[in-house]
Amino acid sequence: MRKDLIELDGSEGGGQILRSALSLSMTSGQPLRIRNIRGRRSRPGLLRQHLTAVRAAAEICAAEVEGAELGSRELAFRPGAIRAGDYAFAIGSAGSCSLVLQTLLPALLAANGESRVRISGGTHNPLAPPADFLRDSWLPLLQRMGAEVDLELLRHGFVPAGGGELLARVRPARWRPLQLEHPGAALRRQARALLAGIPGHVGERELERVRQRLGWSDEERQLEFLAEDQGPGNALLLRIDCEHICATFCAFGQAGVSAERVAEQVATQAIGWMESGCAADEHLADQLLLPMALAGAGSFTTPRLSAHLQSNRRVIERFLPVRIGDQALDGGGHRIVITSA
């Protein structure tokens, strides 16, 4: 049966609209056309990371594609049948491996067999969730929703050099709903300063500022030296394990920004989330919406609604028979509720 074409304006939400639309087109079988891709960005059109996601999606479902080239502002994507397999995709820059993998996972979870996906590029990119976030925060929630995915970080890759690598093993699964009302009691905390080709005193200063801002003990703060050929790069990661969720926050060292400022950025993120009492921080909320919609139902609380979440909601409701509601919480925050349309 021929399915109706879904047409989208890609100017509002940047690459998020493209990635979500590709995931939904593959899983629903509905053909897609996006115009004005990243039209409001300083560098509009498809960048390497987006192009890798398009080509990878096309390979996995034998899609017919028009406009799959660097700088393209319009894309037509007509999916075929999803095929399990052993796949390898190279971004060719420090573009985010995490975002490419997130684009492909919904389809591979609906495939007819087990798949392996190896993606090379940036694993720790300031404009995307780091691999640690996927492994520690996002995937455990998807596993509670029925997904069967194992993720290995084979090699770190920072901006601008890239060279990182992820390996995912994906087995077919059925989605089930999940409700996340609050995080529950904190069980464990860990701060990690990653250094690749960067002096140790940078990480020491970052971790000292974490101690000052958050009061975390020596045992809760760790300096981690990576092989120099995986850099140069520096990331400060905070992980907070709670009864119902694991939260991950990250900030990146960069030229002209002090180690103390990097630590202030990530500590402020963590404090804001802890004080809110909500289950999902702003970035995790962005990433939970699509899998919950694929499950057909679910809910979570979050301190605020990002522009990414808002644009993602509009795309999802074009493809799937769901309603995504927003309930204001007393004292601030939002409850996002997904129901059948």
Curated annotation (Swiss-Prot):
One of its GO terms (cellular component) is cytoplasm. PROSITE patterns: RTC (PS01287). Coiled coil: none annotated. Keywords: ATP-binding, Cytoplasm, Ligase, Nucleotide-binding. ATP binds at Q102, H283, L284, A285, D286, Q287. GO terms for biological process: RNA processing. This is RNA 3'-terminal phosphate cyclase. The gene is rtcA.
